[in-house]
């Protein structure tokens, strides 16, 4: 390995390096450094051999040196300890050995902690995650900041490690802490374009409205650095992910965030996506990311998923636990259900006036909910196509569905008008029948008002859908 590369490994996390080119890690000094010790060495030579063993990852030689009496917390040039160097290159086995030998996990030099060194290490997220977990298990402080007031979670966010971020927060790291420039972990993730870290931080309760010292929010920082998709996502008025995990205990959070860690390949595929679709957003918000590949393999869209029956869930390999999460989410979204199974009873003329009136009231209320839903969609729908965050199918698909909706509403309006005319006819016949006791005027007036209100509501819903159709066609 080249000397330059070794010097790069020895630079402190966060870019706080020394002015000198000599970092105290000479490489070609002793041939026997890579071999087992053949006899007692002078203290200075032991230190050099120790450094060589650390940089080459020679665990057996490190153990032999420690057995010979060298301190596990030996201070090398610039005050770094062996554990700090091992953490900075994400050598999990070496970190484990040094900790087991009593190395101080809370050591810091010029406010550069071992945990910060691990979070800014050059290695895979799996290696870094294990190193951080080992250090946290030895009571390393997740909130101790460096000279620039950057905490470990900020380094993990800046370097694009969502699982490391989650682990730190689960151990008490302040997700909204700010550095000397007012940057939070979310700001750093937005600045570097780490979308998967942004989503994880929002789940953990990161405040997207915190401003930097120059008055910029994370979304504005993302826009300035040309991360348009992150800017669009952070600019949304409502965020279904925000604070989703805040109320969990530390153990629950660790379990929730790391249960899928065993499937490394799937996690990597998911975390390296280029754009979220509506299905992915829905699953991610429920913590069901592991279902993404399964549903895509079966060509199941979000619309199909939301309309599945219970037998279809099982048929498509969706477990009972996952079914419960999806059904619970649907229950929160659904409006008051009308029992349309009662409709055939109307034809038998056995239904009471109160029951029929109740049915009409429910129908009117349902139409009102639908009108409100469409109005909300029209309000939230982006005016410009570049503001759309999710992957959308061709607008023609949406337009055709809207046309179908308008047609259905027109049919519904026509049927309600027929129903109104029929009831009016029955009412007139009853009023003219001498054998019938006249109805109380107030009740008759009230029934008439209900029918009129229902008809007007249905017509209004049709008008709203028509406007929605025109809006989509213009886009």
UniProtKB/Swiss-Prot annotation:
Mapped ANK repeat ranges: 45-74, 78-107, 110-144, 148-177, 181-210, 214-243
Main localization, broad class: cytoplasm
InterPro entries: Ankyrin_rpt, Ankyrin_rpt-contain_sf, Asz1_SAM, SAM, SAM/pointed_sf
Top-level taxon: Eukaryota
Entries under Gene3D superfamilies matching the protein: Ankyrin repeat-containing domain, Transcription Factor, Ets-1
CDD domains according to UniProt: SAM_ASZ1 (cd09521)
GO cellular component annotations of the record: pi-body
Phosphoserine PTM positions: 17-18, 20
Pfam name, any one: SAM_2
Localization: Cytoplasm
Function, in words: Plays a central role during spermatogenesis by repressing transposable elements and preventing their mobilization, which is essential for the germline integrity. Acts via the piRNA metabolic process, which mediates the repression of transposable elements during meiosis by forming complexes composed of piRNAs and Piwi proteins and governs the methylation and subsequent repression of transposons. Its association with pi-bodies suggests a participation in the primary piRNAs metabolic process.
Description of how the protein assembles with itself and partners: Interacts with DDX4, PIWIL1, RANBP9 and TDRD1.
PANTHER family listed in its UniProt record: ANKYRIN REPEAT, SAM AND BASIC LEUCINE ZIPPER DOMAIN-CONTAINING PROTEIN 1
Protein's UniProt name: Ankyrin repeat, SAM and basic leucine zipper domain-containing protein 1
Organism of origin: Atelerix albiventris (Middle-African hedgehog)
């Amino acid at each position: 390995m080249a000397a330059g590369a070794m010097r790069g490994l020895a630079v402190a996390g966060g870019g706080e390096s020394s002015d000198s080119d000599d970092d105290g890690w000479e490489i070609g000094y002793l041939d026997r450094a890579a071999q087992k010790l053949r006899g007692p060495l002078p203290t200075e030579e032991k230190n050099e051999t120790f450094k060589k063993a650390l940089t080459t990852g020679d665990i057996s030689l490190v153990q032999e040196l420690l057995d010979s009496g060298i301190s596990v917390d030996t201070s090398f040039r610039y005050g770094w300890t062996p554990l700090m160097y091992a953490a900075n290159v994400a050598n999990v086995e070496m970190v484990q050995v040094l900790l087991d030998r009593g190395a101080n996990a809370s050591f810091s030099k010029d406010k550069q902690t071992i945990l910060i060194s691990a979070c800014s290490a050059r290695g895979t997220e799996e290696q870094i995650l294990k190193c951080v977990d080992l250090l946290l298990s030895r009571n390393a402080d997740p909130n101790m900041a460096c000279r620039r007031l950057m905490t470990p979670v900020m380094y993990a966010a800046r370097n694009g490690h969502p699982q490391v971020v989650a682990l730190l927060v689960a151990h008490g790291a302040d997700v909204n802490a700010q550095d000397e420039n007012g940057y939070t972990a979310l700001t750093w993730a937005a600045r570097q374009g780490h979308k998967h870290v942004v989503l994880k931080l929002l789940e953990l309760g990161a405040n997207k409205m915190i401003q930097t010292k120059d008055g910029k929010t994370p979304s504005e920082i993302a826009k300035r650095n040309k991360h348009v998709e992150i800017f669009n996502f952070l600019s949304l008025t409502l965020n279904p992910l925000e604070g989703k995990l805040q109320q969990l205990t530390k153990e629950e959070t660790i379990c929730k965030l790391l249960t899928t860690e065993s499937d490394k390949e799937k996690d990597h595929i998911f975390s390296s996506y280029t754009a979220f679709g509506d299905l992915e957003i829905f699953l991610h918000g429920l913590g069901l990311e592991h279902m993404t590949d399964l549903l895509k393999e079966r060509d199941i869209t979000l619309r199909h998923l939301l309309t599945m029956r219970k037998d279809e869930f099982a048929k498509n390999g969706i477990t009972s636990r996952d079914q419960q999460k999806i059904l619970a989410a649907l229950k929160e979204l659904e409006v008051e259900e009308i029992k349309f199974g009662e409709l055939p009873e109307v034809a038998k003329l056995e239904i009471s006036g109160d029951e029929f009136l109740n049915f009409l009231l429910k129908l009117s209320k349902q139409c009102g909910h639908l009108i409100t839903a469409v109005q909300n969609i029209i309000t939230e729908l982006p005016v410009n196509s570049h503001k759309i965050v999710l992957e959308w199918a061709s607008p023609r698909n949406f337009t055709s569905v809207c046309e179908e909706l308008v047609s259905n509403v027109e049919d519904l309006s026509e049927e309600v008008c027929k129903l109104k005319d029929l009831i009016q006819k029955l009412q007139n016949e009853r009023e003219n029948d001498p054998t019938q006791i006249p109805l109380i005027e107030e009740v008759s007036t009230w029934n008439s008002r209900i029918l009129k209100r229902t008809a007007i509501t249905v017509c209004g819903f049709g008008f709203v859908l028509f406007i929605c159709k025109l809006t989509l066609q213009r886009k």
